[in-house]
A protein has these predicted regions:
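Bacterial N-terminal signal peptides
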Residues: 8-17
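Exposed beta-strand/loop interface patches that mediate assembly or binding
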Residues: 25-130
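Sec/Tat signal peptide C-region and signal peptidase I cleavage site
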Residues: 20-24
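Bacterial N-terminal signal peptides that target proteins for export
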Residues: 1-9
């Protein structure tokens, strides 16, 4: 019996020692015919306010100069925004997808085009099983 416990503990230690936590890359911006910025990582937090804005906070902040290099004038790099009134159905789907990702500890990929209230404006989201 002690041999099984030792084997189990060794395998557990090996699994923990060799696993790497999911760490997000800094959001990056691409200059293409349709300029956009993209984030792949964890949903650090998600926030909704009475002004009808949803903010998704990045695990690793965006470098504001990266956004300005593709023509986006943003003041805040730690989050991206959705203005709910622009597209309420998309905002609802986005919020539920982001919450599902956060609850299941899965990374998301989001793309942002344009800006709103000093934040990059989110226009799509992916949730992929890891």
């Amino acid at each position: 019996m002690p041999r099984r416990i030792l084997l189990f503990m060794s395998l557990l230690f090996l699994a923990i020692a060799t696993s790497t936590p999911i760490r997000a890359a800094t959001p990056i911006c691409h200059s293409t015919p349709h300029n956009y910025c993209q984030y792949h990582g964890m949903v650090k937090s998600i926030y909704v306010n009475s002004g009808n804005i949803i903010l998704l906070y990045f695990d690793t902040p965006l470098h504001i100069n990266s956004a300005s290099s593709v023509g986006f004038n943003v003041s805040f790099g730690e989050a991206a925004a959705i203005y709910i009134n622009d597209n309420p159905e998309f905002a609802n789907l986005f919020y539920s997808t982001a919450l599902a990702a956060q609850a299941s500890n899965q990374p998301v990929t989001i793309q942002m085009r344009g800006e709103h209230s000093g934040y990059l404006k989110i226009d799509r989201i992916w949730l992929s099983k890891q």
